[in-house]
């Protein structure tokens, strides 16, 4: 198992949930956290603990976004019209690494970030190597021509464990994806329940 896989599955073990719905997640075999003391029964969480856990789970899902970056996204969400929790999800789904993952150009969020950083992705015909780049409605995301035949890209497009959400239009023959609209929480294909309202409560303390 690679270091990236270990880090990814460590998040699953810490949360006690298979947050990406991956068949190989260790929590499919056990329901306790990592380490030798992982099997100890956990006490009931305080309200703060529940809110913190919700934040950690959402941060972890999006490939362990740093606290500084996550809080910056939250602040932006509060400045937009509408529900701050819904806005938070919408902003996270507009990240380029999220769209690349959703389009099934790669198999994991972590791989999406690396794929972009290495210059394999174009947005509206121009190469973008910043994984946090904010995609706009109507943007066309595509895999660079020389990268389309990479084995892991071809394998990812065939993954049956997840579908492309309807707010992204994908042409797997051309390896392109059009960002159709900003999704609501209920549109996003999370494998586990996400509770952005608890994150709003956490930062509002």
UniProtKB/Swiss-Prot annotation:
GO terms for biological process: ribosomal small subunit biogenesis; translation. Residues 18-46 are annotated as: Disordered. GO terms for cellular component: small ribosomal subunit. The keyword RNA-binding applies. InterPro entries: Ribosomal_uS4, Ribosomal_uS4_bac-type, Ribosomal_uS4_CS, Ribosomal_uS4_N, S4_RNA-bd, S4_RNA-bd_sf. Part of the 30S ribosomal subunit. Contacts protein S5. The interaction surface between S4 and S5 is involved in control of translational fidelity. This is Small ribosomal subunit protein uS4. The gene is rpsD.
């Amino acid at each position: 198992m690679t270091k990236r896989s270990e880090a990814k599955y460590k998040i699953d073990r810490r949360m006690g949930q298979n947050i990406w719905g991956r068949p190989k997640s260790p929590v499919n075999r056990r329901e306790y956290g990592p380490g030798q003391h992982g099997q100890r029964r956990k006490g009931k969480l305080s309200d703060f603990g529940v809110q913190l856990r919700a934040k950690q789970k959402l941060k972890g899902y999006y490939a362990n976004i740093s606290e500084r970056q996550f809080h910056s996204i939250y602040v932006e969400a509060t400045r937009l019209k509408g529900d701050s929790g819904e806005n938070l999800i919408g902003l996270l789904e507009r990240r380029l690494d999220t769209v690349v993952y959703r389009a099934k150009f790669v198999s994991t969020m972590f791989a999406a970030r690396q794929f972009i950083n290495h210059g394999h992705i174009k947005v509206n015909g121009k190469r973008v190597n910043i994984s946090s780049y904010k995609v706009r409605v109507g943007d066309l995301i595509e895999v660079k021509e020389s990268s389309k035949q990479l084995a892991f890209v071809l394998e990812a497009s065939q993954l049956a464990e997840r579908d492309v959400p309807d707010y992204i239009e994908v042409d797997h023959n051309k390896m392109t994806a059009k960002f159709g609209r900003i999704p609501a929480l209920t549109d996003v294909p999370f494998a586990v329940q996400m509770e952005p309202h608890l994150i709003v409560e956490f930062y509002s303390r």
